[in-house]
């Protein structure tokens, strides 16, 4: 009885092994045409001249900025059917996209400086009183720094740069000294001039 059981387990194991091998072989065979198709696409896409793209076994001319490919060409080296970008979408360059790109939206702490058009995205900047904290992330607006009382502002805050404060304190005595220094030089010069003329 034990021998029969071992024989049954052995034949079942072989059957499962063969079944797995056949399944793997079938998957490889099914995948082969797909790999050949990708290889052909890569090969042909390199043969299309600049400004053209590969579609349905032919090279087609790109659509111009502000449009997208509605239907590819059927005759080699011609342009397919291009359609103008719908409102709220754009393409900046000649392309072979099947849809235009959605326009950006300004964040709540930004204001629009240029609206989206068929050929350019919407341009936004930080609102008045805010500046871009990190140029790598233009959406990160921060409140402008206010210089402490008595410290002069060297550069006002704008949408791209924070306020720059002077490193020296603007003291009323310093201003008085700066005003009186040229005045005292003038008085001394007049006195010396009068003495010399006598």
Curated annotation (Swiss-Prot):
Cytoplasmic side: 1-20
Keyword Disulfide bond: yes
Cystine pairings recorded for this chain: 48-59, 60-73, 63-82, 85-100, 103-116, 106-124, 126-141, 144-157, 147-165
Role this protein plays: Receptor for the cytotoxic ligand TNFSF10/TRAIL. Lacks a cytoplasmic death domain and hence is not capable of inducing apoptosis. Protects cells against TRAIL mediated apoptosis possibly through ligand competition. Cannot induce the NF-kappa-B pathway.
Keyword terms of this UniProt record: Cell membrane, Disulfide bond, Glycoprotein, Membrane, Receptor, Repeat, Secreted, Signal-anchor, Transmembrane, Transmembrane helix
Keyword Cell membrane: yes
Listed transmembrane segments: 21-41
GO cellular component entries: external side of plasma membrane; extracellular region
Database matches in Gene3D superfamilies: Tumor Necrosis Factor Receptor, subunit A, domain 2
Biological processes, Gene Ontology terms: negative regulation of extrinsic apoptotic signaling pathway via death domain receptors
TNFR-Cys repeat boundaries on the chain: 47-82, 84-124, 125-165
Protein name: Tumor necrosis factor receptor superfamily member 22
The species this protein was found in: Mus musculus
Extracellular side: 42-198
Pfam families: TNFR_c6
InterPro entries in UniProt: TNFR/NGFR_Cys_rich_reg, TNFRSF10, TNFRSF26_N
Tissue expression as described in the entry: Ubiquitous.
Entry's Gene Ontology molecular function annotations: TRAIL binding
Glycosylated residues, chain numbering: 62, 158
